[in-house]
Amino acid sequence: MTYALEVDGVDKSFGGATILRGVAFAVEPGSTTAIVGPSGCGKTTLLRLIAGFEKPDAGTIALAGRVVAGGGWTPAHRRSVGYVAQDGALFPHATVGANVGFGLPRRARTPARIAELLEMVSLDPSFAVRRPDQLSGGQQQRVALARALAREPELMLLDEPFSALDAGLRANTRRIVADVLAKAAITTILVTHDQPEALSFAGRVAVMSAGRLAQIGTPREIYSTPIDVATAEFIGDAVVLSAHVDGGRAHCALGDVAVASNGVHGNARVMLRPEQIEVTTDGAGMSGTVVDVEYLGSEMLLGIRLDTGDGEVPERVTVRRFGATALTPGDRVGIRVLGQAVAYDI
């Protein structure tokens, strides 16, 4: 298979500070990949290297089988790559039509083609005469996407394009953009620090930490079977407990819990997601006391201190509960574990 993008052993430093170390991954044509990580992990630098705005210190980058960095250099304007920045980077004194037309060859800057591009991103062609300051944040991002689509790129790079939008607008704009790119069958890479955004937007997720790719997989794999505790805690709320693993079971503060088969034995740490811990009122399973409640609308996060034997340090776990059943600090509850935990060597 010829990959749409291949990154192999890429390093990058600035002023003696190492930003990327041995980054390697490949992206299939027509797929969507999200690179997620905390601020400063190197994800935007990686995107800029792919776009051709920076040169790697080591390693190679290939687009559709052609090396464009390392062992040769192809400048950004000669790569078939679209790029949408965090703020959209529209020209403030130009109309929407002029902004979109900037991505087109001069002879192709016709009203009909600009209208077609605006319609692709669910904007009415009448928006062509407006200026960026007359648009909402979500509309500005869609104009930036239309401008990038005008070049008919083989690869689209999105650098945290939704982060400046409020929650409701962000979700709606994200859905529109994902739909546009899917219909156009354009290979897409999204960089974000927003974990739910990465999991919902892409078919594959790459978790970046301290300049390295910690794990690449489907959203379900990344969330359900993270490669280590740090990745588990970064990608979502996690309950991590000390345990002893033997014969597919982990003995921990939650009792004997089934664990996924991954070769871990003996003293270990186990991870569960809060939704895997069920609160009961029938006394089944372990028992504990509610110590705090975080109300989140359709769900709540409960902090529960587990009952322990004499001389043992009480463990506190976080439980996600859906529905409107009211619980308050001091309430006594039972706890039951659903599914399997993931075990990690100490």
From Swiss-Prot:
Subunit relationships: The complex is composed of two ATP-binding proteins (FbpC), two transmembrane proteins (FbpB) and a solute-binding protein (FbpA).
Family matches, as SUPFAM superfamilies: MOP-like (SSF50331), P-loop containing nucleoside triphosphate hydrolases (SSF52540)
Entry keyword annotation includes Nucleotide-binding: yes
Protein name, UniProt field: Fe(3+) ions import ATP-binding protein FbpC 3
Similarity comment: Belongs to the ABC transporter superfamily. Fe(3+) ion importer (TC 3.A.1.10) family.
Subcellular location: Cell membrane
Tagged with keyword Iron: yes
Membrane disposition: Peripheral membrane protein
Gene name as annotated: fbpC3
Function: Part of the ABC transporter complex FbpABC involved in Fe(3+) ions import. Responsible for energy coupling to the transport system.
First-listed, main subcellular location of the protein, grouped into a coarse class: membrane
Cellular compartments per GO CC: ATP-binding cassette (ABC) transporter complex
Residues reported in the UniProt entry to bind ATP: 37-44
A Pfam family of this chain: ABC_tran
